[in-house]
């Protein structure tokens, strides 16, 4: 999936090693997607800085590591998964809101992770919006802000409705996205 081919808005990819608030301010983003990566959220303190600066200003979507960063930023906990999940699909059930609005139930998504969100430690300002058949949290959204996180990879060809989820997210920012 290439977002650049589906919108006329400018898409800028910035490495976590190069991103700063100063850089982002110069770009005046309409939305931010915090992408997957190796390690754990604490390995990338700049992600908390970005959330602190932008969470009340523009929509933010966290994917995998980005999802885990969002959960930790708002007070949740990320733990080791009982077993690493790399290159496996799972069926998820969702609450039909936010980036799931209007999508069918029980669709497949692709997972690549060895960390997961602790379901016993979800902060009150986040709402669980999707789980899989093992009750692993697959998505959250903020209760008041346009902040979303998904544990899986909507950009994967094996994730169903990934384009639709990106469209729902980007439309909140006023970005037109064609599925």
Predicted region positions:
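N-terminal beta1-alpha1 cap of cysteine-dependent amidohydrolase-like domains
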Residues: 1-56, 160-179
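Hydrophobic anchor at the start of a short beta-strand
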Residues: 10-11, 60, 147
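Short gly/ser/thr-rich secondary-structure transition/capping motifs
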Residues: 11-18, 41, 90-93, 112-113, ...
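Cysteine-nucleophile active-site neighborhood
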Residues: 26-101, 106, 166
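Histidine-centered divalent metal-coordination motifs
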Residues: 64, 113, 153
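Residues that recognize and position ribonucleotide moieties
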Residues: 90, 108-110, 148-150
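Catalytic beta-strand/loop cores that center a nucleophilic Ser/Cys/Thr
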Residues: 98-144
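C-terminal and late-domain segments of enzyme folds
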Residues: 127-131, 135-141, 146-179
